[in-house]
Structures are given as structure tokens and as C-alpha cells.
Curated annotation (Swiss-Prot):
The gene is dut. Gene3D superfamilies: 2.70.40.10. This is Deoxyuridine 5'-triphosphate nucleotidohydrolase. Residues 150-177 are annotated as: Disordered. It comes from Bartonella bacilliformis (strain ATCC 35685 / KC583 / Herrer 020/F12,63). GO terms for molecular function: dUTP diphosphatase activity; magnesium ion binding. This enzyme is involved in nucleotide metabolism: it produces dUMP, the immediate precursor of thymidine nucleotides and it decreases the intracellular concentration of dUTP so that uracil cannot be incorporated into DNA. Substrate binds at R83, S84, G85, N96, T100, I101, D102, K110. The keyword Metal-binding applies. It catalyses: dUTP + H2O = dUMP + diphosphate + H(+).
Amino acid sequence: MSLQDAHNSSSPSQKLPLWVQCLEHGQGLGLPHYATEGSAGLDLRAALPENESITLSPGQRALIPTGLIFHLSPGFEAQIRPRSGLALKNGITCLNTPGTIDSDYRGEVKVLLINLGQEDFIIERGMRIAQTVIAPVTQVEVRLLDPNSDLTSSQTDLSNQPNTGRGTGGFGSTGQK
């Protein structure tokens, strides 16, 4: 199947449902939504009390409530990601990116923000603070390879794997250019 065929076979009407429970402090903020037709992430808003704000000083972090509980389908996760505009203009980003909301989590979705900028940043009720991307999850069965045992054809013989150019190099071993 070509990329064009795959694109043509999907339509906006075939979107998966995301069931969301709105908590009392999230009332009036609206549901997460895509900013444009091609957006990958749904915008999340700060569910702070009316007339209250949080000031993030440079280097400070805070856990911001969204007022939402996601009921994800099994086999999916919600990834919490920063908004590029907040990062570029103010140095505001998510500390653990992407944050993962597992399908069996039933608590409020919260966003851990940090101010990496040079000035205080004020977060107010209803402000778009992050985005969430719903993604499929692949779980694996972890198996311990015993290097002293005879590997059968149903097992992977890692001893015959060729060396790679990367080898055991990590954390910057491939360079920056």
C-alpha cells in the first residue's frame, strides 16, 4: 500500500474516542481539542481556581492540574508534551517529556512545568499549558538470555549478531553534525 493509499483510506470520521471525565475545578474550560486539522496534539489547559495564578520563577517547577481524567482504551497511552510556543518565547517546558499517562491510570492528568527562561512566568486559569498525543503502546515479554545454554531455532542467537558501527556507544557517541 502506498503512502497516498494509506492516507486516502483514513478519514477524520474514523477517529478513536477518548473518554474524558471533567472534574469540578475543570468545568468551563472545554474539552481538549486539536488546534488545526493536521495537529497531532490536543491542547491541555490549566485548571487553576478562578482569580488565582501560579508564578513560575526561573528554575522553578510546578505541577499544574488540568481538571481532567482520561479513560484511555487498552493498548494506548497519552503522552504529555510541551507547547513549542511557550518553550520558544518563555522557556516554559514539561520537565518529564514526554510524560506518560497509562491506560489503567484513573487519576487527574497533571502537567509538570518548569521555567527555563530568564523571567517570571504567570500561569492563569484556562491557559494552554501543554499538549497530549494519544499513541499506541507495544508491550513486550522480557526474556533473559542465558549465554551458556544452547539456543534453539525458536530463540534469537545474539552471539552471531554482527558488530555495528555504533557498538556500545551512547550519549553523544554519534556526534552533533
